[in-house]
Regions:
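Membrane-anchoring hydrophobic helices of lipid-metabolizing enzymes
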Residues: 1-87, 94-96, 103-105, 123
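Non-catalytic C-terminal accessory region of glycerolipid acyltransferases
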Residues: 2-11, 107, 140-288, 504-506
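Short acidic (Asp/Glu) patches
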Residues: 68, 78, 82-84, 90-96, ...
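Conserved nucleotide-cofactor-binding alpha/beta core module
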Residues: 102, 107-138, 146, 150
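C-terminal/domain-terminus segments
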Residues: 249-270, 440, 528-531, 540-573
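Conserved N-terminal entry element of GNAT/NAT acetyltransferase domains
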Residues: 281-322
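Short amphipathic alpha-helix that is part of the acyltransferase structural core
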Residues: 308-380
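Acyl-donor binding region in acyl/amide transferases
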Residues: 346, 383-539, 544-554, 564
Length: 588
C-alpha cells in the first residue's frame, strides 16, 4: 500500500469519519503535505532506508550542503555525546543533521517533533516529543528514553529551542527561543561531551509576516518552508567538542542550557574573522647563540645580591644591560624564537628595542647546561618616570605607554610599580612546573628586596594562534574598563550579541574554558600565564593591540601583591613574606 505523507497518518483510522477526512484533505493542501506527497511519489521514496530517504530528499530538492569535513570527523566516535543545534527552518535541518551526523555516530538518535512521523522512513532516527506541550506528561517517556540513551554511551541530537527561530523586532534578527533546561540537565550526565552546531539561514519573509499576525499560525507553514528550500545551499558549522571536565556542572540547568545555546551561536559563520596573514618571508634568520662561556662569565660577575633564588640546578638573577650585555642579547634572541612559535615576534634576528637598555631583566639559568630557560623584563616605574617642566609625568620611558593611555589615576602614576612584560619560557620548559615557578619565585624575591613595589602591572599577550572569537570572549569575561586607562589601538572584533547577552545574564568568566574549547580546533585553553594572574586576583583593565609586537592583542592587568592569596605569597615570597606584608603601604 502506498504510504501517505498526510495528517491522516497522525490520526487513528478508526476515528476518521467523513468530516475528519475532509479536514485532513484541506489540511494537507494548506500545510503543503500534498506537495510533499507528490515529491515522495515522483522520486519513489517509499520504503527506502533512512539514509537513502534522506539522500533522495536532498537530491529531489537540489539542496547542497556546505560544512567542514574535518570538523565532522572531530566529533567523538564513542561515548556519551550531546549535540545541539539552532532551529532556523523548523524541519529540514533535522533530516540533514541526522543524515550527516550518523555518518560518524551510527548510534545517533534525534529528539524530534511528532509532526515528523509523516516521514515514516525516517522514524528510526527519531525519539518523538511534542514541543507545543513541553509540560505534557506524555512527553515524559521520550525524555526518559533520551537521557537513558546518552547515559548508556549514545549520541543524541536535540533542538532545545523546541520551536523554529523567530524574528526579533528589537534586534532586527532571526533568533533562537530560549533553550529548554533539558539541555542543561543532559550536560550533567557523567562523562558527557557536547558538540554545538549552528545552521545558517532563515525562512521566507512571508513566514515572519505570518508570525507577526499570529505567532502560532506560522507552524502551519513549516511544510511549505521545507519545500521552498529547493535549490538552496545550506551552511552547517560544527563546533569542537567540549569535554566533560570543562563544563561547569555547578551551574544550574537553565544556565547550562543558555551556555549550550551561546556556544551554538559562537559557530555562526557571519561572526567570524581571520587574522591578517603574516608574511613569513619578512622574518630574518635568528641571531647566533651567544657562547655559554661568555654568558657564564657575565652572570658570575653580577653582584651577589642580584642572585635571587637557588633551586635544584636552577638559579634566578636580575641584571641591567650595562652589567650583562650579552645575557640581554641572548634573552632577546630567545624571546624572538619563542614569540615566533606563537605567531608573534618582531621578525628581526632578536626581539629587542631601546627599552632593553633601561629596564630590569630577571632571568632563570639552568646551571647544568648553562642555558637561559626564561625571563621577564621589568620596568621599575620610580626609576623610569621623570617629570616634565609642566609637572606632568614623562611617560616616554614606559613601554606600555606606547600601547595604552595612562591617566593620572592609574597605579603607575600613583606609586612605585613594576611593569612586567616580554616574558617567555623556552619550549622545553613551557609545560614544566619549574619554569613558571622559578620566574615567579624570582619576582617574589625581587619584591622582597624592594618592598616598595606593591603593585605589578603588565600585559598578557593573547597569541594570534587564538581565534578572534576566543580573544573577544576573554576580553568580555575579564576586562572592567575605567577612565584610568584606555588602549591606543583597540581590539575591534565584535562579540556575537547572543554571547554578550549570555555574559550579561550569567557571566562569562566561569565558562571561558568551555567556550574556548568549542572554538579552538586544537583544544587550546586559557593561556597558562593568564590563569596564573587570575589566581593572583589580578584586575584586568583593557585589551589593546601592540603595534610594536606584530599587532598582537595584549590584556592589561595589575596585581596588588599584598592582596594575593596567602598560599601563593608563601610560595613566591617564601621567608620574605612577613617583612613584605608588614612594609607600610604609605612608604614610597
Amino acid at each position: 500500500m502506498q504510504k501517505q505523507i498526510s495528517l491522516g497518518e497522525l490520526i487513528s483510522h478508526e476515528k476518521q469519519n467523513g468530516l475528519i477526512k475532509l479536514g485532513i484533505r484541506l489540511g494537507d493542501r494548506l500545510l503543503g503535505l500534498r506537495k510533499m506527497q507528490e515529491l515522495y511519489e515522483i522520486n519513489e521514496m517509499q520504503g527506502l532506508s533512512k539514509e537513502e530517504f534522506s539522500d533522495r530528499l536532498l537530491d529531489a530538492l537540489n539542496i547542497s550542503l556546505e560544512f567542514d569535513e574535518e570538523a565532522l570527523e572531530r566529533i567523538p566516535k564513542t561515548g556519551p555525546l550531546l549535540l545541539a543545534s539552532n532551529h532556523p527552518f523548523g524541519g529540514i535541518e533535522g533530516v540533514i543533521l541526522a543524515r550527516l551526523l550518523s555518518q560518524v555516530r551510527p548510534d545517533l538518535k534525534v529528539l524530534a517533533n511528532t509532526a515528523l512521523r509523516v516521514f515514516a522512513e525516517l522514524n528510526e532516527y527519531f525519539i518523538f516529543t511534542n514541543p507545543l506541550a513541553p509540560k505534557n506528561a506524555k512527553n515524559a517517556p521520550s525524555l526518559k528514553q533520551t537521557i537513558g540513551h546518552v547515559k548508556k554511551g549514545g549520541a543524541l541530537l536535540i533542538f532545545p529551542a523546541g520551536k523554529v527561530s523567530f524574528f526579533d523586532s528589537k534586534s532586527k534578527r532571526v533568533v533562537e527561543h530560549e533553550w529548554n533546561r533539558i539541555a542543561g540537565r543532559m550536560l550533567r550526565i557523567p562523562g558527557v561531551q557536547y558538540s554545538p552546531i549552528f545552521v545558517s539561514g532563515k525562512n521566507s519573509d512571508w513566514f515572519y509576516r505570518v508570525e507577526r499576525i499570529n505567532f502560532k499560525m506560522r507552524m502551519f507553514f513549516l511544510g511549505w518552508e521545507l519545500l521552498n528550500k529547493k535549490n538552496h545551499n545550506l551552511r552547517i558549522d560544527i563546533g569542537n567538542t567540549v569535554t566533560a571536565k570543562r563544563i561547569d556542572v555547578e551551574a544550574g540547568d537553565i544556565e547550562l542550557a543558555a551556555l549550550a545555546r551561546a556556544q551554538s551561536y559562537a559557530q555562526e559563520a557571519s561572526w567570524r574573522s581571520s587574522w591578517p596573514e603574516t608574511d613569513a618571508k619578512a622574518f630574518s634568520p635568528l641571531a647566533e647563540t651567544i657562547e655559554k662561556a661568555v654568558l657564564h662569565n657575565e652572570i658570575q660577575s653580577l653582584p651577589k645580591e642580584q642572585h635571587l633564588v637557588e633551586y635544584r640546578q636552577f638559579s634566578v638573577y636580575y641584571a641591567y644591560r650595562e652589567q650583562a650585555p650579552n645575557v640581554v642579547l641572548e634573552i632577546a634572541r630567545l624571546r624572538e624564537l619563542v614569540f615566533r612559535e606563537h605567531n608573534e615576534g618582531s621578525g628581526e634576528e632578536r626581539d629587542t628595542d631601546h627599552f632593553d637598555d633601561i629596564y630590569t631583566h630577571l632571568f632563570v639559568v639552568n646551571n647544568e647546561t648553562q642555558e637561559l630557560i626564561g625571563a621577564y623584563r621589568m620596568g621599575q616605574s620610580d626609576r623610569l618616570l621623570a617629570k616634565l617642566d609642566n609637572g606632568d609625568d614623562d611617560l616616554s620611558s614606559i613601554y606600555l605607554a606606547q600601547m595604552f593611555n595612562f591617566g593620572k589615576q592609574f597605579i603607575n602614576r600613583q606609586e612605585p610599580c613594576l611593569e612586567m612584560g616580554r616574558s617567555f619560557l623556552t619550549p622545553e620548559y613551557q609545560r614544566s612546573f619549574h619554569g613558571l615557578y622559578l620566574l615567579w619565585r624570582g619576582i617574589g624575591a625581587f619584591c622582597g628586596k624592594f618592598p616598595q613595589y606593591r603593585h605589578l602591572y603588565g600585559t598578557v599577550s593573547l597569541s594570534k594562534l587564538f581565534d578572534k572569537r576566543s580573544v573577544a570572549i576573554i576580553k568580555a569575561a575579564l576586562v572592567k574598563e575605567t577612565e584610568a586607562v584606555s588602549p591606543k589601538n583597540d581590539f575591534d572584533f565584535a562579540l556575537h550579541p547572543e554571547i554578550k547577552s549570555f555574559g550579561e545574564e550569567f557571566g562569562l568568566r566561569q565558562h571561558m574554558s568551555a567556550f574556548l574549547q568549542t572554538i579552538e580546533e586544537d583544544g587550546k585553553d586559557i593561556p597558562i600565564l593568564l590563569k596564573h594572574y587570575m589566581k593572583l586576583n589580578a584586575t584586568f583593565h583593557a585589551l589593546g593591540v601592540d603595534k610594536n609586537f606584530a599587532d598582537t592583542p595584549g590584556l592589561l592587568l595589575s596585581v596588588h601583591l599584598p592582596s594575593a592569596p596567602e598560599k601563593m605569597l608563601k610560595k613566591y615570597l617564601a621567608e620574605e613574606m612577613t617583612s613584605y606584608l608588614t612594609y607600610p603601604e604609605t612608604a614610597k
